[in-house]
Amino acid sequence: MRRSTAIVIAVLALIMLPLTLPLTTSTAEAQPADGVIHVSASAAQGGDGSADKPYATIAEALKDAQAGATIEVGDGTYREGELSVDKSVTIRAAQGAAPVLSGAEVPTSWSASGGSEGSGSAGTWSTSADMVRFCTVCTTNADPSAEGMAAHPEQVFVDGKPLTQVASRAEVTDSTFYVDDNDPITMKEPGNNRAGFNVKPHRGASYVIGVDPSQHTVEVAQHSRALSLLSDNITLSGLTVEKYSPVQEWNYTDPEIGGNTGGVMVFASGTGLNVTGNTFRYSGAGSALGIANAHDATVSDNHLVDNGGVGMGINRSSNVTVENNLWSGNNSKGFITKDCGAYCAMSDTKVTHSENVRYAYNTVDYSQSGTDHSELSSWTNNRQVAIWFDEGVLNSSVLASHFVNVPTAVFVEVSKGNTVASNLIEGAGVGIQVAGSESTRVWNNTVTHALTSISVYEDERSNGCNARGSDGSCTLTESWSAEHGLTWDTVDTSIYNNILSSEQVPTDGDTWRYSAMVQVTGAKNADG
């Protein structure tokens, strides 16, 4: 959980530069008489956006919307992707409706091999080899092989339930799938994706499953990005956004969709952003929701659940309110969370290079995970963080939130002037962790059933420098922290009026440090 310069969230701002967008809005036509553009998944083609003749797709509505328009989305599933919004519009669910924006398609052409479902003999079914090819080496880890199958962002769902991806056709069962690709995207330098990628055609993969698709509804994720919200005063409200497969890296340029391959399922920037009452789930490898260069934004009453990697990221933003949201089941792919150096990012929410972020009244709940994360056996391998302030988060707060059975609840790292107050943490590896941060206030929290309730330690880095040469000169400056004069030293930490109870009891073989309710550890500024 160190040197996070290369993390997926920290590069969110880059999407503003190379983004290639296949859908662009055009000069608007006349708006419907009631001022609302209507969309219905069951509508016939050729609609005009009126209540009587709604559009059949969100893309059509976006194309014709004027700045200030409201797009009202009716019930149904909208299988669309790589949508770009560059005007101030509201996209909302119609009253009483539960629309789903899905990146998955339902293949209609399958070929069978072997036995049949339920016959007792193994059988597989394959799509044609014209499905979308996703990058399986585009991880924040420079060596994708270290991540195993987590590096593969592909997704298949049978009757709404996700299958587990496997590495060979021989491993396919009724609960797994395999992607057969004879010409996959590769790295220019084996074992180091930082050297770049060998770009391949957008399509060319075949999906293999172990159930008869004629007896089930089979969905295959075929889009990387759902939405890019790129203007001021955009509202997204009441939608379920699901089953997209963004990769973690931002710098793979697909020949058809360009930079939309990477980073996030939904990207949002601008002033006056409002994201409320949505569900973001089943994002393949990249973050479900990524916010960058946003100001005066509100993210409230959303569910970010069951995503392959990070739930939400915030970067280079200010005055962002994050309230009354729920996170659960994220990092379902199982990305590495321990000893991962520069690419550590796995969290429910990661905030970087930002100020005045208010995270309040939220819930992060892993009570259904089947693992007691206060046990040493969990902490040994799982360091996922519920809410993580990193690399220059300024004057922000984590308030009145509830964390249930999480590896790490709150982590404040190399930041300044932040408050962690009035939170309830029930079960954790570490409840509250502060590292290399100035003027952190830890007040009025309750931590129960944790391996360590509060941990405060000195980060070995200093003055916004991630690495130094043998002569002591900085060779890797973190520009935001350096510009804001951060020392990256743990000073002026205030721990006041907290309740710490029911600490996890050490067992045979545990070392002394795991029995402490509160740890305070010093270090030299020797690394960076």
Located regions from the model:
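Internal hydrophobic scaffold segments of catalytic domains
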Residues: 83-107, 152, 161-165, 301, ...
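Extracellular polysaccharide-degrading/modifying enzymes targeting complex plant/algal/animal polysaccharides
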Residues: 36-38, 42-268, 273-274, 473, ...
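Sec-dependent N-terminal signal peptides
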Residues: 3-15
